Amino acid sequence: MNLFNIEGKVALITGGYGALGGSISLYLSQQGAEVVIIGRSEEKAAPLINKIKEEGNKGYFVQADVMNVEDLRKAKDIILERSKRIDILINAAGGNVPGATLRDDQPIFDMKIEDWDKVINLNMNGTVYPCLVFGEAMAAEKKGSIINVSSMAALSVLTRVVGYSSAKAAITNFTKWLANDFAQKYGDKLRVNAVAPGFFIGEQNRNVLINPDGSLTERSHKILNNTPMGRFGDLSELNGYIHYLASDASSFVTATVLPIDGGFIAYSGV
């Protein structure tokens, strides 16, 4: 018996064509899951959907804004009509907003309240709403795996990213709350966990970590000096644990939030 087998499972990935979500979507399709990519832009999702199909695997796109409950309900109806069920939900939609990020010498009072609201809405509500809408369908079947994307910034205080960190901390707490609620009300086959990625270079943080000439910024050096593995992560290094949580191999695992950070959070610097 292969505990890691997810062949034929229906896996929803919000933000499934972004850097992180796209890596997960492609990987899960290669493991035999039917991947449903949820996002706002069919045009942006098309190259990934085409690649999935070219490799002989299954995947399709459903348009929805994760911050719009009615959008998500319509998406749920489309998915249940086409795929009949939801086995896996991965909430990969999220990101930072510049106005909710501070310079090292900038007081918090300069933060733009409207951008604080945006980053909280995108990350926190953009995770909670899909859990409620798609989770209802999973609860009806009393089985499935929900995987949220928190952040190492939720577990350790970082300078500058106050809005993003606060939103991800909310996701961490909500993940644990929902896991307890689901297990007690719907049984032990419906699980909720989260991953907390450390530092992975992507489009959103590239300018903060990499200088125009390709050298590392001062912030990057601070990060790497406090990362025992001494390097940034590669997005593909998230896929193994996502696979584990999505499969029956993690059947007794719920309410966990795992840092995937090269040891950053465990290092005191001494």
Language-model regions, residue ranges each:
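Short C-terminal tail/terminal secondary-structure segment
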Residues: 2, 156, 242-243, 254-270
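Conserved glycine-rich cofactor-binding loop
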Residues: 17-18, 41
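Conserved glycine-rich Rossmann-like NAD(P)H-binding loop of the short-chain dehydrogenase/reductase
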Residues: 33-47
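Substrate-binding pocket helix/loop in short-chain dehydrogenase/reductase
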Residues: 100-117, 223
